[in-house]
Swiss-Prot record:
Residues annotated for substrate binding in this entry: R17, D18, S171, H200, Y291
EC number of this enzyme: 4.1.3.39
Keyword Lipid biosynthesis in record: no
InterPro entries with a match to the protein in the record: 2-IPM_HCS-like, 4OH_2_O-val_aldolase, Aldolase_TIM, DmpG_comm, DRE_TIM_HOA, PYR_CT
Residues of the active site: H21
A GO MF term: manganese ion binding
Protein name as it appears in the record: 4-hydroxy-2-oxovalerate aldolase
Residues engaged in binding Mn(2+): D18, H200, H202
Amino acid sequence: MARINPNKLYVQDVTLRDGMHSVRHQYSLDAVRAIARALDRAHVDAIEISHGDGITGSTFNYGFGAHDDTEWIAAVAGECKFSRITVLLLPGIGTVHDLKYACEAGARSVRVATHCTEADVSRQHIEAGRKLGMDTVGFLMMAHMAPVEKLVEQALLMESYGAECVYVTDSAGALLPKQYAERVKAVRGALKPETEIGVHTHHNLTLGVANAVAGIEAGAVRVDASLAGMGAGAGNAPLEALIAVLDRMGIETGCDLHMLMDAADDLVRPLQDRPVRVDRESLSLGYAGVYSSFLRHAESASKLYGVDTRDILTELGKRRMVGGQEDMIVDVALDILKSHGAEAAQ
């Protein structure tokens, strides 16, 4: 699906999808309508809406959502005249049938997300997105965990399946600007000129905006961000801050900065039951290279078993756990508790 203005940076908001993690997937329909309406009026190119772990992510493992994905999608679609409605789909969680239902509810773009070494599982879903006439994107998560050459190989696979854009996704907020730029530049250089590159950053090391800018300078033309940084861990690149920086750089976005500031402070921040910020727990995510959405699961395990959240996250990083292994968080907490008991007995 061709973009309306291919010469302008494409701004993809993720407040209503990645931000789901911040509220344990409990956005009300009224809340998503109000936020979508504000984003649409501010002329954000696209708005992603679904369970934090993608369509059909509402499960015991990831957390149950307040509403069905199609309800959320339809609510957002009903408010938008300008912005394209986007969904996230993780193969193994969401299916082709789920994607069809999302499209019927109003979604016009899909990002098919896999771990950065598992692009081969995305073929069926990327092909389905193209057949449905959707803007179809490949989304390589946890990009810090693969060498540059491997990342390029996986991006080429997604492109060969029909992806019109491939994202280099720093799901853990673990990359430094130079490292991120290196990955984006390599992927940009390997793919066809017409295949776009996107960047998705997290703020766990306070580098969300800096990494987004580094990725844009390295060749990305799509960028993710969220109002007030609403997202997993310490959040994503704050949309209003990113737009301000890009404006200072002379990069056209077409977004209304003041409207975004108002939406961030008036609509989004009041919904946070846990502040989305860099603190000892979220900083540990970036430092240990752990999937950002593990934060609230790890905090729950910490409270239940009396183990420091940082210890849980550090051990998850050592074990190289990735998205989809949320069930291992409790195992790690119990192992730490057991080791503490053994130490006390000595």
